[in-house]
Amino acid sequence: MHPCSSVLHLLLRCMRGCCRHTRSRVPRRLRRHVSYIRLIFKSLYFNSLTNSDVVTDSILEPVFWMVEVVTRWFGMVFVFLVVALTSSVVFIAYFCLLPLVLHTYSPGWMIWHICYGHWNLVMIVFHYYKATKTPPGYPPKMKTDVPFVSVCKKCIIPKPARSHHCGICKTCILKMDHHCPWLNNCVGHFNHRYFFSFCLFLTLGCMYCSVSGRHLFIDAYNTIDQLKHLEAEKQGVPVTGIGLLIGIVPSAGVAGKAVQVAQEVSQPPYTYKDRMFHKSVIYMWVLTSTVSVALGALTLWHALLITRGETSIERHINGKEAKRLAKRGRVYRNPFSYGKLNNWKVFFGVEKRSHWLTRVLLPSGHAPYGDGLTWDIYPLKKDMMPV
């Protein structure tokens, strides 16, 4: 055997003997207390059911807390932004576009634009106000006979089906979809219809402004571009892409040309009012086009959820449940879906054909189906089928 290996083997035996000797010197009673303390410490955090999702949520808990605090404190700021931006578009439409419509459009088109624009504006204002002021619905805190599926770990109260806890509102919400910072309110059972209708009619209104004002936008953009060229020539900057971007000191030849242009153009071709008109048209078109794309995508997503009879939260829950059952060879079926058309009827509260007009296309403050605690709507409302 190699001498180094023999020395190493002897050293390991000595260390093992020392450890055994030290352990034997520790009283058994002390070792028992140490084991008990270790057990108590592990009981505070150890859970055999803990998975990667729980660990991820625990790590991101400070981020969630910060988002909740910011959303809670800036809720009124978001509401103010919605009101301010919408009011600015309405102001431009009334003082810039409406006079143009009255002087250039035929009587038929003029009546159509005025009627549609005001109808759309009324629907937007009504549904936004109702979505903001209507409580989403809360589970009863007193003991009742209503069946519940679980107990909220935050509120410590029975939680009915489709109810979830909102960390921003600090309470449980009936049929919670999400907390909307633009409403400064949760979207739940009693204001879900108002929220979706607001998104739908605001999207339609922005699309209407964007499409009907596209020619005005092109004219205004070209006019502003011409004004930039004229101002650049006056200052002696070459009328090129680089010259418009970089305000350099003009050369002698360019300076002479600038003096000549300044002498020829003694009066500005457009007044301040004309400039503000063109800038307002550009602002309105860019804003409404952007909102049309962003809010339109959100509206389509919520329309898909309504068709499936689920909320944004239930979409994730149902997806996980479907994957779990798929591994067992089973198909998951949403118990709260009554069919594509019936889901829309339940959502809008449509009971007869005339309700599509009075409850969907006109402002209506009717209550939704049910109380948000139980969901046996379809067996009790079979007369909805022929609508």
Swiss-Prot record:
Q: Which UniProt keywords apply?
A: Acyltransferase, Endoplasmic reticulum, Membrane, Transferase, Transmembrane, Transmembrane helix
Task: Indicate the principal place this protein occupies in or around the cell.
Answer: endoplasmic reticulum
Which chemical reaction does it catalyze? L-cysteinyl-[protein] + hexadecanoyl-CoA = S-hexadecanoyl-L-cysteinyl-[protein] + CoA
User: Which range is the signal sequence, renumbered to this chain?
Assistant: none
Pfam families hit by this protein: DHHC
| DHHC domain ranges (all copies) | 150-200
| Protein's name according to its UniProt entry | Palmitoyltransferase ZDHHC16A
- Give the source species: Danio rerio (Zebrafish)
